[in-house]
Design a protein with these regions (language model features):
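Catalytic core of non-heme Fe(II) oxygenases with the double-stranded beta-helix
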Residues: 110-177, 215-223
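Non-heme Fe(II)/2-oxoglutarate
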Residues: 2-8, 52, 190, 195-244
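Active-site lining segments that contact anionic ligands and/or coordinate catalytic metals
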Residues: 173, 180, 201-205
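Non-heme Fe(II)-dependent double-stranded beta-helix
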Residues: 1-25, 30-118, 122-123
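Active-site rim elements
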Residues: 73-76, 170-172, 194-195
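Conserved metal-binding segment of the jelly-roll/cupin
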Residues: 178-192
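A structural signal for short, well-ordered beta-strand segments
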Residues: 102-104, 132-134, 206-210
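Short hydrophobic-aromatic micro-motifs
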Residues: 29-30, 132, 184-186
Length: 244
């Protein structure tokens, strides 16, 4: 067990109520890490980064996804080093971990509901992933807020095993809404998916995932790292990006 992980585990502690919800429900919504008076600045930085992205980094399907928000500017540097997020990784992954990916996702008006799914199945020796979603816009029931099935991370099956139509409403599902600047932290094995955006405006978010340190990341962050990013981030960020 490396020294950085021990330090993170020692310094990052969740309130009991949040730790319990992660254990029991598999997800939690926290009003942070972006302060209310910084949300407009974050939204402007998001839009500018999306417009400046190289076409190779843009993937358009039922939503628009822009990869590698680690290297999109200083407005995003604090998101993946947020203390409660790292504490959740210590609780769920429970071993040295690193960032696998951090990207933007926009649900345009009319985007249909996403199928319930898991990001990673639970492995025999525990849970391999923690996901997070930072709300650039308010998440509401009409604009594509993410739905979760509480406790489903404890199941041995996945939605496709038990649902004929994984886009259908599932008994007991809960909408994870919140004001702009909030963060959803979730166990990668919990059933989840975005809902339909029935509003007249896009719904924007920044999403990412932490994985076990020895696993292969979704994006080769070391190869993509820009000098200006390396020059401004600290030791904790470099450790989490595995570029120290």
């Amino acid at each position: 067990m490396d020294e950085f992980f021990r330090a993170i585990a020692a310094e990052s502690k969740l309130p009991e109520s949040i730790a319990r919800q992660l254990t029991d429900a598999g997800y939690v919504v926290i009003e942070g890490p972006v302060a209310h008076n910084k949300c407009e600045q974050l939204a402007k930085a998001y839009d500018a980064a999306v417009l400046a992205a190289h076409p190779d980094d843009v993937r358009i399907s039922s939503s628009t996804r822009i990869s590698d928000f680690v290297n999109r500017g200083p407005d995003f540097d604090e998101l993946y080093i947020y203390g409660p997020l790292l504490a959740a990784c210590c609780q769920i992954i429970a071993r040295p971990f690193r960032l696998s990916t951090m990207h933007a996702r926009t649900l345009e008006p009319g985007t249909p509901v996403e199928s319930l799914h898991v990001d990673f199945k639970r492995e025999d020796d525990g849970w391999p992933m923690v996901g997070f979603i930072v709300m650039v816009d308010e998440f509401r029931s009409d604009n594509g807020a993410t739905r979760f099935v509480p406790g489903s991370h404890l199941a041995t099956n996945v939605p496709g095993d038990v649902m004929e139509d994984a886009t259908a409403e599932y008994d007991g599902e809960v909408m994870a809404g919140g004001p702009a600047g909030s963060i959803i932290i979730y166990n990668g094995s919990v059933w989840h998916g975005w809902t339909a955006n029935r509003s007249a405006k896009p719904r924007r978010s920044i999403q990412g995932a932490f994985i076990r340190r020895e696993q292969q990341s979704g994006v080769n962050l070391k190869a993509r790292m820009r000098p200006e990013t390396l020059s401004r981030i600290g030791g904790l960020a470099k450790y989490l990006l595995d570029v120290e």
